[in-house]
């Protein structure tokens, strides 16, 4: 399993409805990408969120960035950001869940 961690810094306080819309509008497309495992949005400051996306392989994460990141995120999120997202990707080397 691999994960990508995107740190997004916004110009203004984050509007949570933006990510509620992302859930509604992108869930089907995310699930359609082979290897997709999950998507989480964590608000870490008033003007900052961290996206954590899990997939079987890095290639699925790259595909998500190309197919969803460059379109929906580019149109709906990028104009609100205070700079380019910080993106890190790598293998998951430990995990515990319920």
Which residues make up each language-model segment?
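Short S/T/G/P-rich N-terminal loop/turn motif that feeds into the first structured element of a domain
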Residues: 1-49, 56-68, 80-98
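Outer-membrane beta-barrel domain signature
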Residues: 70-78
């Amino acid at each position: 399993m691999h994960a990508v961690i995107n740190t997004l810094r916004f110009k203004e306080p984050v509007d949570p409805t933006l990510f509620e819309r992302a859930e509604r509008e992108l869930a089907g497309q995310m699930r359609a990408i082979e290897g997709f495992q999950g998507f989480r949005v964590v608000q870490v400051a008033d003007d900052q969120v961290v996206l954590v996306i899990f997939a079987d392989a890095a290639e699925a994460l790259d595909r998500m960035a190309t197919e969803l990141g460059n379109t929906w995120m580019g149109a709906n999120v990028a104009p609100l950001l205070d700079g380019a997202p910080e993106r890190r990707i790598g293998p998951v080397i430990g995990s515990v869940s319920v």
